[in-house]
From Swiss-Prot:
This is Ribosomal RNA small subunit methyltransferase F. It is found in: Cytoplasm. GO terms for molecular function: RNA binding; rRNA (cytosine-C5-)-methyltransferase activity. Belongs to the class I-like SAM-binding methyltransferase superfamily. RsmB/NOP family. PROSITE patterns: NOL1_NOP2_SUN, SAM_MT_RSMB_NOP. The active site is at C247 (nucleophile). Keywords: Cytoplasm, Methyltransferase, RNA-binding, rRNA processing, S-adenosyl-L-methionine, Transferase. It comes from the Bacteria. HAMAP family: 16SrRNA_methyltr_F. It comes from Escherichia coli O9:H4 (strain HS). InterPro entries: Methyltr_RsmF_N (IPR031341), MeTrfase_RsmB-F_NOP2_cat (IPR049560), MeTrfase_RsmB-F_NOP2_dom (IPR001678), Nol1_Nop2_Fmu_2 (IPR027391), Nop2p (IPR011023), RCMT (IPR023267), rRNA_ssu_MeTfrase_F (IPR023545), RsmB/NOL1/NOP2-like_CS (IPR018314). NCBIfam families: nop2p, PRK11933.1. Specifically methylates the cytosine at position 1407 (m5C1407) of 16S rRNA.
Amino acid sequence: MAQHTVYFPDAFLTQMREAMPSTLSFDDFLAACQRPLRRSIRVNTLKISVADFLQLTAPYGWTLTPIPWCEEGFWIERDNEDALPLGSTAEHLSGLFYIQEASSMLPVAALFADGNAPQRVMDVAAAPGSKTTQIAARMNNEGAILANEFSASRVKVLHANISRCGISNVALTHFDGRVFGVAVPEMFDAILLDAPCSGEGVVRKDPDALKNWSPESNQEIAATQRELIDSAFHALRPGGTLVYSTCTLNREENEAVCMWLKETYPDAVEFLPLGELFPAANKALTEEGFLHVFPQIYDCEGFFVARLRKTQAIPALPAPKYKVGNFPFSPVKDREAGQIRQAAAGVGLNWDENLRLWQRDKELWLFPVGIEALIGKVRFSRLGIKLAETHNKGYRWQHEAVIALATPDNVNAFELTPQEAEEWYRGRDVYPQAAPVADDVLVTFQHQPIGLAKRIGSRLKNSYPRELVRDGKLFTSNA
């Protein structure tokens, strides 16, 4: 694999020499940093099993190497890397996999380790959505996830990835993560804080990542991280699990932040060792039981992961002074809900008791039941999935609901050819050789739902959202 030149400040190299355990070679560290990062993907098990995914993609000649800490994760090598971007493959467009760095799969593995099965989870810094979608898959779309993102521009990307992966149990918020300890005290069974950091571990992806690095900046970032972990710890219920992670390598933003929390709440913080998380985890294990992953250990990004349990309640923070405002939705009455459910089933959309129908004007939404306890405590940017808009003749079913709820074995499902599917993703109407009979047609490709079409004569009218329409090379050019 080709080398690339990474910029290293002298003070950073000095700090790394001090931070690196004697069992590791500093020369190996430098050599690993100069190698470009291996690509990796995670199969979205909400859509397809790992076995079926491997069978589906076998004809492509991809080399898929299992990632030890994530059963559905693989390093991927392709002969035609430049011919077709991974993000333009049919399997990516339909949400069958997520392009995710291998080491960033570690925090969620830690969150669910040892049979942990939380029902209400918060992802404090969620965009672009790799970990939120991984959590949702581990929860099998059950329970509820609060996915928060402070950056307004990244909330849209977060929602797009959640929608593409067919996830229905997520509520999105857009806050500074420091508000949650006050706003929702002791409300969550598990919390992932993948904290904003100095990014020292990402030099293999971005050789200039350390251009603005300084020890002073690290100290400022660590101060913010202490405030974030304190807030998250307050939002965690007694007995709950908190995973703290970063993609940086210095001890100040990693071990020291966790030790600060333990010193602040000595009777309430218990570190849960991660040495048994996967075979060879002990190679990255610190004396506290954390994983401090230098890039040469597993040939991935540098990363840090700590897992802890809240063993008892801690004093509450002062009550919030802000007002959330009125919640603009109301629950749909049982009788009407039954009619809506029946109409939705007619086009192949089904849901279980984890989701409940709510209404706002002519909009129908499905919210995860587990999030209802948070209504009135935080303001949501987006909640659950938009099911439909009502109109005089019935319902206008929404694309995100089709992707999350459709069952491809529905009687009105219509399988497209590769060429027709590509036309669909380009936002064009499709003219199949033999048009389906039904007026509302569940469009599938590779037996995966990709949208809902209206049949008009022999034409299938495209309803693919304009913001998702693709141009450039798509999958048939790779056939």
